[in-house]
Amino acid sequence: MSRGALIVFEGLDKSGKTTQCMNIMESIPSNTIKYLNFPQRSTVTGKMIDDYLTRKKTYNDHIVNLLFCANRWEFASFIQEQLEQGITLIVDRYAFSGVAYAAAKGASMTLSKSYESGLPKPDLVIFLESGSKEINRNVGEEIYEDVEFQQKVLQEYKKMIEEGDIHWQIISSEFEEDVKKELIKNIVIEAIHTVTGPVGQLWM
């Protein structure tokens, strides 16, 4: 039995990640495809993260970074097991978000990556570009929904993309929604059909 693919959607806030994940789940109906999003706010760490994001509690930046990281590690075994059982996972945000947001707040990218080192490695990361309209919409109730901060996050994402150690697919914000939906579907189908070898380890 071939293993499943780990396919991650990344991008700035309000770039359409969840929408595109749901499009995939609807357009490729299968009992071998599951959706997972981060942070998972139902766990102990997830509830602490939710309190922070909704401004109910404050933590220093180092604690915040570790909380997000721990939240992903809580699901590392689950992800590994699902992939080995032939289940493809469509993941809304992953370690790259954690590193980009932490680095945008001044943390060392190298240190932030070390916390995530060893997580299951994605077979594909789809990065959704944000147009000026989407970026300017990044003003909201949650703590990171700030235009200036989101621009800093974008620069950190670009650094990771340029490293070339992960298979990134960048989706332009200029595509019409129906074109974007079809393009992403085809990219995901190809990734599922071409996945080979054991699950890798991220940043090892």
Curated annotation (Swiss-Prot):
Question: Gene3D superfamilies, from UniProt?
Answer: P-loop containing nucleotide triphosphate hydrolases
Q: Which organism is it from?
A: Cowpox virus (strain GRI-90 / Grishak)
Report what the protein is called. Thymidylate kinase
Q: What is its EC number?
A: 2.7.4.9
Alphabetized, the UniProt keywords read: ATP-binding, Kinase, Nucleotide biosynthesis, Nucleotide-binding, Transferase
Pathway assignment reads: Pyrimidine metabolism; dTTP biosynthesis
Q: Name one GO molecular function term.
A: ATP binding
Q: Kindly list the positions annotated as binding ATP.
A: G11, L12, D13, K14, S15, G16, K17, T18
Which Pfam families does this UniProt record tie to the protein?
Thymidylate_kin (PF02223)
